[in-house]
């Protein structure tokens, strides 16, 4: 992000949640990066951490909720990526991952480094107390300039915009005891069901 992400308040807010240290890209040049350039910067940042073998992201972090940031970073790193993850445990040289699927969950064992996009229920984050916040101010935070990562901003120009074509609504109100049956019939005839 821009220079504000390295402020004392941001540092304390992040490090008071239990992290040992922070490595931050705090550069005004990063303010207008698109998702691809942000992913390249994050991958370069991960490479700076010796022995890093897992990158945890939120399920829809900084990419306008598109759920693509974890996959983009994984692509730059050459690591596998798993999304919708509700639990992660270390197992020897790899990880045991519990992933939500349309039909329930599945457990995956993967060796080596991995990018994992966790769901909001993957962990309960404690609310930091005053002691945690004060101690966070003493923890190390290294700030990296975007130029030090070798990432160049990608120029994007919006060349046009279109609104979806408005569709005329039927404005049909179904009532009576058989309203549900009528609704199902109407949806079937419209090709929705």
Where are these regions (language model features)?
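N-terminal glycine-rich FAD/FM-binding segment characteristic of electron-transfer flavoproteins
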Residues: 1-193
């Amino acid at each position: 992000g821009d220079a504000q992400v390295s402020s004392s308040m941001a540092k304390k807010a992040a490090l008071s949640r239990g992290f040992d240290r922070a490595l931050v890209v705090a550069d005004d040049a990063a303010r207008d990066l698109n998702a691809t350039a942000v992913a390249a910067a994050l991958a370069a940042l991960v490479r700076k951490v010796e022995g890093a073998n897992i990158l945890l992201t939120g399920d829809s972090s900084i990419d306008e909720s598109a759920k693509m940031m974890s996959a983009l970073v994984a692509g730059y790193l050459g690591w596998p990526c798993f999304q919708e993850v509700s639990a992660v445990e270390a197992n020897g040289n790899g990880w045991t991952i519990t992933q939500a699927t349309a039909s329930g969950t599945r457990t995956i064992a993967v060796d080596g480094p991995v990018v994992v996009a966790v769901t909001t229920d993957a962990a309960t984050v404690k609310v930091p107390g005053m002691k945690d916040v004060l101690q966070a101010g003493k923890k190390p935070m290294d700030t990296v300039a975007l130029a030090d990562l070798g990432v160049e901003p990608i120029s994007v120009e919006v060349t046009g915009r279109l609104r979806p074509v408005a569709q005329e609504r039927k404005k049909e109100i179904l009532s009576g005891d058989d309203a549900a049956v009528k609704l199902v019939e109407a949806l079937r005839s419209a090709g929705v069901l």
